[in-house]
Design a protein with these regions (language model features):
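Membrane-interface helix-boundary motifs at transmembrane edges
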Residues: 77-89, 140-152
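Juxtamembrane "helix-exit" motif on the non-cytosolic side of transmembrane helices
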Residues: 29-34, 107-115, 165-176
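Membrane-proximal helix-loop-helix units in multi-pass membrane proteins
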Residues: 93, 100-139
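Alpha-helical transmembrane segments of multi-pass membrane proteins
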Residues: 16-39, 167
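Alpha-helical transmembrane segments of multi-pass integral membrane proteins
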Residues: 91-99, 147-171
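Alpha-helical transmembrane segments in multipass membrane proteins, preferentially the mid-helix core
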Residues: 70-74, 129-148, 200
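Alpha-helical transmembrane segments and their helix-start/interface "positive-inside/aromatic belt" motifs
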Residues: 2-20, 72, 146-154
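Short aromatic-rich membrane-water interface segments that cap or initiate transmembrane helices
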Residues: 45-60, 116-125, 179-191
Length: 214
């Protein structure tokens, strides 16, 4: 019983340590920089007095990317790495972390606002780094990817590429279709994220099925 309670206490400590530190951090930032605490805690729609549905497509994309990361990391944690599953297990972990990284970037506009100010580099440099990370992952795990439903992964990449193309030629495309350019740019991006989730889901299921064969 004592051992069980000790494990439970350790779990609760690890569960709440970071959130409590986070709350202290935003309280410190509020006092240090004279920023109202509500800026950190309230919903953006309330702070900006805007429609709660503002940015719904972007918010949905963040949720889906977060779900992608969560299921991949869960499957990685559930799949005990053995000699035969180690490669696939690490692939799931990498896919999960990269998904969460993209979700955080989308949520806080990291590559558009935060990173350029913090590291004094352009947005394009950050996008290039993301691209190199993705290419590096594909090169490292290409054999593993070929064992998965990579067609779904390919479809997701096509939609992401279409979104980038629309973003690269805004004036030309806007001259043809007006404000609907935004729908195509963000719409292709959302469809790419959905494809990314579908691929993450199938890979996670594939990883969990490997447990049954161990």
């Amino acid at each position: 019983m004592f051992s069980s309670n000790q494990k439970l206490s350790s779990f609760l400590l690890s569960l709440y340590s970071l959130p409590i530190l986070f709350l202290f951090a935003i309280a410190f930032a509020s006092l240090k920089f004279d920023i109202p605490i509500t800026t950190f805690t309230r919903d953006p729609a309330v702070i900006g007095n805007i429609n709660p549905l503002a940015g719904i497509a972007s918010h949905l994309g963040v949720l889906v990317l977060t779900a992608s990361g969560a299921i991949c990391i869960f499957s990685w944690a559930a799949l005990q790495p053995t000699r035969s599953t180690k490669k696939f297990s690490l692939f799931l972990l990498g896919l999960g972390i990269f998904s969460l990284l993209l979700g955080l970037d989308d949520l806080f506009m990291l590559h558009e606002s935060i990173y350029p100010r913090l590291f004094r580099v352009s947005e394009n440099v950050i996008l290039l780094i993301y691209g190199l990370l993705a290419i590096g992952g594909i090169v490292k795990y290409w054999r593993t990817i070929l064992q998965t439903d990579y067609f779904i992964f390919g479809v997701a990449l096509i939609f992401f590429a279409l979104s980038l193309i629309v973003d690269a030629f805004p004036e030309l495309i806007e001259a043809m279709i007006g404000q609907w350019r935004i729908l195509f740019e963000d719409g292709f991006k959302l469809l790419g994220i959905i494809g990314w989730f579908g691929y993450s889901w199938r890979c996670s299921i594939q990883g969990l099925k490997k447990i049954q064969t161990l």
